[in-house]
Amino acid sequence: MEYITKMVHDFIEDHDDIKKTDVMEFVGMSESAYRDFFKKGKISFKKLIKFAQLISRETGKGSHEILSEWCLHIIRTETIKNAFEYSAITTNAPLLKRLLLLHQNTDGVLKQTVEVYRIVYNYMVGTLSGFELKDAIGRLHNITSKPLLILMNIIRQYNNYFEGDIQKIINEVSEIQKDITNLGPRETFYKECLTFRVCELLAPISLQLNDVKSARDFAESIINANISAKKKSDAYYVIGMSYLPDDKNVCLYNLRKSYELMREVGDLQYIQEAKFNLDFAKVFHGVELDEDSNFRLRAYQKARNGKISLAKLHTILERGDKDNFIIFFENTAEKSIDVMYNCLESFFCQENFFFARLVAKELEKAGADSRALRPFLKFKKLIKGEVLIEKDIISHFNRSDGGSRICI
């Protein structure tokens, strides 16, 4: 901890224009708390984030970079736990790995922390699949820390999501939220991070259930938290898709934003997925695709425009996995009312009400009875129970390194 206090002290000493009162106000510390930090190294993780942001603002060095370095010098148990969650929620796998190695021989609550976050790390780096999470969590015993128990329950919901068991998630999420709300004042950082994780889980689920207002609210909370480009990109995807049937310009703006952010992330697979999502929306709205667009999307657009046969399209669509997008293509390309109604029924029975709505839109374009389609165009399923969210769920992450806010 001495490493951190010395770095902060030297920073303040080197900047004559920065007064102690200004620092205390920025970080949100009383005079006594300020003294305790420098004399005893006593400070909450949230206050460390504010110090990192202050130094970042004046030096140009990224606050995440500064904080990642500090996480390796923290000595108090509660703050170390927060460092683990910080590394996980910001998807900083290298930092999480170093924390796991640093604390691998601990006992008590820290041992529990290492056991839980080792599973998180293995999932992050791909050595553990989403379908294996529940079993991995089930092998953990004697976990007593309330935040860790809540995190374990959220991880189980990731497994349920991969298995397509949306109803089980809906049944359990309100209890998870109650448990988060009941966390004490010492667990404020965890409370906000766990709430963020609930938003991250429910944003795509609400979209699938065609509850677009909730989907947008959850996504806005994720964007405003400003945790990472990857998470913001995922949130812009949800917002963009939620406008797909109704507002071409808003839809394309948000999906383009998602794509641009994913390019910042630099992961080729994620970039390709974001580009696919943007181009899918372009096809849906009749916008000509670029030559570098996905070959199946271009084939679908050509078939819709009569440039290739439906037989050739189906041959092309057979290459690769079949997700909801490809199923949509296969069943709407020939504009057959019967085929599209069967597809609509299939999506609806699977409770994928958003894609059911997209097919209903295509049926409407093809001349099907709009009165019969009205229930499918408007149907949505609400998640039972109140999920308490705020746009500023993680207020201490809201300040970017440049000091500006992220807005939609």
Task: List the predicted regions and their residue ranges.
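C-terminal non-catalytic interaction modules
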Residues: 1-17, 22-30, 259, 280, ...
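Recognition helix of helix-turn-helix/homeodomain-like DNA-binding domains
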Residues: 27-45, 69-74
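Helix-turn-helix repeat elements of alpha-solenoid scaffolds
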Residues: 85-99, 122-138, 161-182, 206-221, ...
